[in-house]
A protein has these predicted regions:
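Membrane-interfacial alpha-helical segments at the cytosolic side of multi-pass membrane proteins
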Residues: 140-146, 232-249, 279-290
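Interfacial helix-loop-helix junctions of multi-pass membrane proteins
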Residues: 178-181, 226, 257-283
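N-terminal transmembrane-helix/juxtamembrane module of multi-pass inner/ER membrane proteins
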Residues: 2-41, 67-139
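Interfacial segments of alpha-helical transmembrane regions
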Residues: 64-72, 138-175, 179-190
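Membrane-interface helix-boundary motifs at transmembrane edges
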Residues: 28-33, 54-66, 145-155, 243
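Aromatic-anchored segments of alpha-helical transmembrane domains
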Residues: 15-24, 75-77, 164-172, 256-267
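Membrane-interfacial catalytic/cofactor-binding modules of polytopic membrane enzymes
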Residues: 173-244
Length: 312
């Protein structure tokens, strides 16, 4: 009923969810249970719909797409809670160090902001590009799922999960919140550039890093991780998993080339964050490939065993 790679995804969700509940209870954090329950029910409902298509409609493409997507939705939910449960940070922030590393590479974020404040139309275009990350992933899921590329679909989802867990782990020991907590850009320049991440965002990140969280709600979740950049991971996933689609790959590549200045400018990322995101993607993608191969072998072995038991 549930394939091995689907079971893997859902097991990770359950384990991480149990850790979340333990940490919430231990820290006494108040929670918007209704808000999280709504998203959780959407995920569970999608799984049930996937099982309906598998068992009743006998449609493997739709069922795999729905179940794996539901697993990823639920993982995003429990993963964001886990990230917040690591607050306040327990190690020194390394943003100043990354600024010095960026300087060695010739990168200076305030100069980038100033450059685009003088070109507001281009900055507005990059802002649109910046917010295409999630829609791009949705399109990739639909393309892979509904064209029957189940191995690539599983590889895609497990890559995202592994990259997220690796990013959270790195951030827990090397916390960063991006350039906006280091540089105070004058309001007139920031307004001209139309930054997606403003000074109030940076102020809230600093507060959370010092005080932690006392109330969790999906309505006010912030992106906590600066290094490595998960926006970079998502961009790399979009390019990698559509590269075999000849008519689409150059469009996706062009869009995500623009994503680089977009995430630096509007995501308030260090250049080091971007490079770190590429490394995390490469490691997660390779590890996920091995995991999918192992899980596929397990699925094949299970199928053979079922056939053997069915023989007279």
């Amino acid at each position: 009923m549930i394939m091995s790679y689907e079971r893997f995804v859902l097991t990770v969700v359950v384990v991480l969810g149990a850790i979340d509940l333990t940490l919430i209870a231990a820290k006494g954090v108040r929670v918007d249970w209704a808000g999280y329950a709504m998203i959780g029910l959407i995920g569970l409902g999608t799984i049930m719909l996937g099982l309906f298509y598998r068992l009743v409609r006998q449609d493997a493409r739709i069922s795999e797409t729905l179940i794996l997507t539901a697993g990823f939705i639920l993982f995003t939910l429990v993963g964001s809670v886990f990230n917040y449960m690591l607050l306040p940070v327990h190690f020194p922030r390394i943003d100043d160090f990354l600024v010095s590393v960026d300087k060695l590479m010739g990168y200076h974020w305030p100069s980038l902001v100033l450059f685009f404040s003088e070109r507001p139309s281009f900055s507005a275009l990059l802002k649109i590009v910046y917010f295409t990350s999630l829609p791009q992933l949705v399109i990739v899921v639909l393309l892979l799922g509904f064209t029957g590329q189940s191995r690539k679909l599983a590889h895609f989802h497990i890559t995202g999960m592994m990259a997220a867990l690796l990013s959270i782990t790195i951030w827990a020991f090397l916390p960063t919140f991006g350039t906006s907590v280091v540089w105070n850009i004058p309001d007139d320049i920031a307004n001209k550039a139309g930054l997606a991440v403003d000074q109030s965002y940076a102020t809230e990140l600093i507060r959370l890093s010092l005080e932690g969280v006392d109330y969790l709600s999906p309505a006010n979740v912030l992106g906590l991780i600066g290094f490595p950049s998960f926006h970079t991971v998502m961009a790399a996933m979009s390019v990698f998993f559509t590269w075999h689609i000849v008519w689409l790959r150059l469009l996706v590549l062009a869009l995500n080339i623009l994503m680089v200045p977009a995430l630096l400018l509007h995501g308030g990322h260090h250049l080091s964050d971007f490079l770190g995101g590429l490394v995390v993607f490469a490691v997660a993608c390779l590890a996920a490939s091995y995991a999918v191969s192992a899980l596929r072998d397990d699925r094949a072995a299970s199928a053979l065993a079922e056939r053997a038991r069915a023989l007279p």
